[in-house]
């Protein structure tokens, strides 16, 4: 199976994409940025491959930000949104229905809008509301444009003084992504490539991806979406500690089936709470006999953002190799476009 949209090339360009998007956001005149002293809360508005940039920033900087941050994936903004709200709206295409609806809702309530897109309707909505628009580096599929959206979010928060560590974290992340690309790029064959080897081990089993804490939860969900969209295969995700209060009860009832079908993938990072590390070990003892195999991916790099993006990047590469080894083209997402066309026909 060929890569008809050169999706692997887009994946390989992530480190440079992150740098270019940072430069674009850094060039915005400081006077155009919202004033930090006027902000009491932050909302991240976005869906899919664009919206997850908000999840990334929330997970990476929630411990540093002096105001609460909420990620929204719906049609309207909640009642607390108002003039003291910093509303980031992310849509790579600029035309995502739900993001446009939430942005209009936030604008109606007087929120301070910062939109990030390649133009489109979102740019017009933001500017009409007196907000700021930051242009993304063009030419990527939205799910391969995570750097084009994460970097402006981090850069704006840094320049506003809300996330003083964000600029250094971006640099650390870019360094680690380049290092990971050297390990996982298409020129590295066989078991020497950790993403190819992981895809080989997964084979045609169904991935069950577990992470720990905020970083692990976002990474696990991104992996799930990567397998869904790139490999066109089912996958499921959950996170510690929540899964130990519900999902753990599901294992064993159909153990003979899950032992054939499910591969548990543990996403580990250096910022796990000590109790979460114990939960990984204790829960694995229960689940191990109920799944085909247990695999682990360890985050590398410095800083919360760097380790989160590193885990996500491993998911990008692994899902693409999983697609190709199963004769699936990783680029096209026909089901999503068919649904969008159907929705456009409805009132």
What would you call each of these model-derived segments?
Residues 331-347:
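Short, small/acidic-rich helices and loops at N termini and domain boundaries
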């Amino acid at each position: 199976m060929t890569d008809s949209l050169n999706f692997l090339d887009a994946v390989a360009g992530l480190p440079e994409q992150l740098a270019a998007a940072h430069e674009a956001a850094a060039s915005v005149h400081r006077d155009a940025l919202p004033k930090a002293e006027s902000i009491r809360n932050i909302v991240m508005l976005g869906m899919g491959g664009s919206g997850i940039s908000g999840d990334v920033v929330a997970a990476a900087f929630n411990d540093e930000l002096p105001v609460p941050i909420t990620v929204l994936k719906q049609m309207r903004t909640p009642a607390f949104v108002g003039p003291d709200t910093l509303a980031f709206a992310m849509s790579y295409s600029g035309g995502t229905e739900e993001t446009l609806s939430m942005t209009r809702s936030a604008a109606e309530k007087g929120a301070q809008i910062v939109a990030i897109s390649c133009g489109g309707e979102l740019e017009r909505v933001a500017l009409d509301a007196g907000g700021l628009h930051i242009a993304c580096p063009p030419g990527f599929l939205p799910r391969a444009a995570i750097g084009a959206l994460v970097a402006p979010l981090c850069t704006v928060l840094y320049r506003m003084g809300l996330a003083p560590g964000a600029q250094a974290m971006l640099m650390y992340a870019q360094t680690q992504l380049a290092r990971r690309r050297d390990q996982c790029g298409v020129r590295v064959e066989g078991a020497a490539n950790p993403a190819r080897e992981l895809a080989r081990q997964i084979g045609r089993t169904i991935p069950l991806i577990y992470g720990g804490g905020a970083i692990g939860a976002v990474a696990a969900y991104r992996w799930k979406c990567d397998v869904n969209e790139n490999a066109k295969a089912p996958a499921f995700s959950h996170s510690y500690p929540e899964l130990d209060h519900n999902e753990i009860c599901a294992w064993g009832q159909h153990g003979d089936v899950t032992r054939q079908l499910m591969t548990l993938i543990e996403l580990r990072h250096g910022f796990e709470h000590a109790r979460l590390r114990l939960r990984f070990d204790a829960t694995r003892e229960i689940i191990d006999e109920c799944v085909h195999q247990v695999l682990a991916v360890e985050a590398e790099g410095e800083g919360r953002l760097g380790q989160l993006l590193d885990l996500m990047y491993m998911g990008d590469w692994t899902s693409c190799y999983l697609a190709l080894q199963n004769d699936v083209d990783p680029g096209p997402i026909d089901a999503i476009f068919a649904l969008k066309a159907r929705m456009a026909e409805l009132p």
